[in-house]
Each structure stands twice: as structure tokens, then as C-alpha cells.
């Protein structure tokens, strides 16, 4: 009975994390791109973070494709939100000044042709031997994961 209830609970989740490469954390959900995109934006801003820039990746690829001889449509919709956390970024860069390359944080939201899912993804912080940086990177990943969960 416990297994059945656990299976039911999992099936009811509006969001599922997918196996991805070691550098990517990938989630998929249902809904419209615009609704998921807006929920993600509100989740970022709800943490008190300012979105520095929004990259419209799908539009850029569609626009530049003909110039490079590409005809495949990679995304129906696809945007990235760039932002940083002053607190977590400072922890990270105090632990290792070279960790500046980890900022800004980017969360992507996109749809793929012939796929009804909406995907949200972010880069997984890499491994390090520096204990202070390891802790700061764990905080970065927790922040990104919390944002995605809040968006759902």
C-alpha cells in the first residue's frame, strides 16, 4: 500500500526532474510556454533577485539560421534569464576569486517542436576541491533548484 501511495504522489507532481548530462539539471512540465516562463520570472523575482537580461535563444537561432545554412528549427520557444545573488555570489568569489566565471546564473525555459512538454534547465555547478567554494556552489545549486520548484 505504501508503494502504491508513493507512486500516486509521484504521478501527481506537476514537475519532474529528468536525467541529464553531468553539467545540466533538467526539468519538464506541462502547460503553455508563456505560463511557465512567467512563473519562472516571478520565482526569480520572488527571491528578491533582479533579472539582468533575458536572452531570446529561439528567436536568435531562427533569425541566424538562414545565414549559416541551417534549416532545422531547434526550439518553438526558448528564453534564458540571467541573474545573480549578491549574497551567494560574494560567498563564491570570496572562496575563489576565479569563480567569477560562474556568474551570472542562467535558467533556461523552452519548448521543442513536436513535444508538448515545457523544459526548464540550468547548469550544474562543477566539482571543486576547495571546501569553501564547494559550500558556496551547493548554495548556488540550492537557489537554482528552489527557483525552479517555486515556478512549478
Language-model segments: residues:
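Hydrophobic h-region of N-terminal signal peptides that target proteins for export
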Residues: 11-18
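Terminal, regulation- and interaction-focused segments at domain boundaries
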Residues: 19-48, 55
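Solvent-exposed, acidic/flexible segments
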Residues: 29-37, 54, 74, 130-133, ...
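Compact, glycine-rich, soluble single-domain proteins
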Residues: 56-102
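C-terminal partner/receptor-binding element of secreted or periplasmic proteins
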Residues: 122-152
Amino acid at each position: 500500500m505504501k508503494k502504491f501511495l508513493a507512486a500516486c504522489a509521484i504521478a501527481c507532481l506537476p514537475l519532474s526532474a529528468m536525467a541529464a548530462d553531468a553539467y545540466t539539471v533538467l526539468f519538464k512540465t506541462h502547460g503553455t510556454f508563456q505560463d511557465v516562463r512567467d512563473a519562472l520570472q516571478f520565482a526569480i523575482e520572488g527571491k528578491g533577485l533582479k533579472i539582468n537580461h533575458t536572452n531570446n535563444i529561439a528567436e536568435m537561432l531562427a533569425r541566424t539560421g538562414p545565414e549559416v545554412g541551417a534549416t532545422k528549427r531547434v526550439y518553438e520557444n526558448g528564453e534564458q534569464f540571467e541573474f545573480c545573488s549578491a549574497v551567494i555570489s560574494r560567498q563564491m568569489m570570496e572562496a575563489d576569486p576565479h569563480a567569477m566565471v560562474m556568474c551570472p546564473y542562467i535558467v533556461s525555459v523552452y519548448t521543442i517542436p513536436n513535444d508538448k512538454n515545457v523544459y526548464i534547465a540550468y547548469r550544474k555547478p562543477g566539482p571543486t576541491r576547495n571546501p569553501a567554494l564547494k559550500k558556496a556552489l551547493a548554495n548556488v545549486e540550492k537557489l537554482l533548484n528552489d527557483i525552479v520548484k517555486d515556478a512549478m
